[in-house]
């Protein structure tokens, strides 16, 4: 039992503070009293102290003297420049004949020193100078000692593979000759974890010598260059018996020249007549700047209906840590392969068109690993607008284009959210939410988002669904054997709507299944069994189940 005694006048002050009176032992009671005294000091009662203590049976009695509350006489700016004071939140009126609050001074000190640390002065210090006390008022002036200007030296890198110091310095923002910035040091670990082709073998260290700061890194090569092959065995809907074999090849080369670049080639054979090719080139820190350049080309042949080609150019800027602001442009063109039959002088479900769009995006994540994610959250947003031009096809009657606006504005929005929650050492709960929207009065099937298959709605053929707006939620549980081997159970639930000019559609789709992923000495093997059901395709049918094999080699 804790009993705090004060004078009758000070008891009025003490009533404003809540403190527990019941404690398991005297040590915890003493800690509660110290916390109370510290709070009184922070609120301006600088002379508050414990005068005496007596312990009687289970009761601890303390006599506390609170004293007078101090106020500012005046806190002058001293030698601190006005621009720095404004950044710290300092206002003269807050420190002139106002109650003295220690936390207010501490916040200002932290803000000033943080600004100094970010601008080349890691050894800056702040103190109160010309201190004077008149009765219960305090007067002082600020005295900021910046210390020596510190510049970054070149990175000291010890690695067992080719990694150019100039590239890594630009990527980390630690450029030789630039002012020291504590934020770059704070973000160092996370930024290095985002590089999939290396592993930090020892904690980084920082040394200061001759007004220069040197960051020492020791990293090892991580085998992440990939050659992935997936074979799928699906029932062939065009034949009463037999299987349709689909395939996919993914080649990703990361850091091929020691400067962080990425080269990718991805090919898919989705059905007998459908194939897709994607090429990617990523160039980080162009000309030593914080800008990253990505170029992508995608080509799709959809059955005997149409071909589609997309050129994408993206420039991203690192906002700090793992936040990126993106600006991108896209040039999209699609052409009919054959001429569909026209029976009612209306446009077919696919048309020839060109679309040039521009947009902005934002990416952020705090994943614990770029590939083998077991903890963290990430999301990205994209929005774009562009001019769409429908081209007249000479194989179609001119009447089908009457009343059709051939030049329109088209809007596209994308959202992708992922969360990996590690509930126990060997169990991870994965939540994902994806969504997309295309807005235009002139939308056709070759405008649509394509969903279905191993990377979107499992239990369905690859790119089975066409949608101009969709929402996809994934819930997945993983039982880990190690960081790269696990059993999984999953569900994919999607709402899909196609607001096409010719024939609007809507559907709900659900995919359920289980799988296994395990690592070998040369790669990772994946096996997934999935069932799919939707309003338009009917209930779950084991005869239409999907089996996916995958093997990823890394070198």
Report each predicted region and the residues it spans.
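Short acidic/His/Gly/Ser-rich catalytic and metal-binding motifs that mark active-site loops
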Residues: 163-167, 335-339, 388-393, 442
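Internal, well-ordered alpha-helical segments in soluble enzyme and binding-protein domains
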Residues: 108-112, 354, 358, 413
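C-terminal transmembrane beta-barrel domains of outer membrane proteins
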Residues: 246-250, 264-269, 273, 278-280, ...
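Gram-negative/organellar outer-membrane beta-barrel architecture
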Residues: 181-380, 451, 464-467, 524-555
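Short helix/loop capping segments that flank catalytic or ligand/cofactor-binding pockets
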Residues: 152, 227, 370-371, 389-391
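Well-ordered beta-strand positions
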Residues: 132, 318, 517-519
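Periplasmic polypeptide-binding modules associated with outer-membrane biogenesis and secretion
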Residues: 1-8, 16-237, 246-250, 264-273, ...
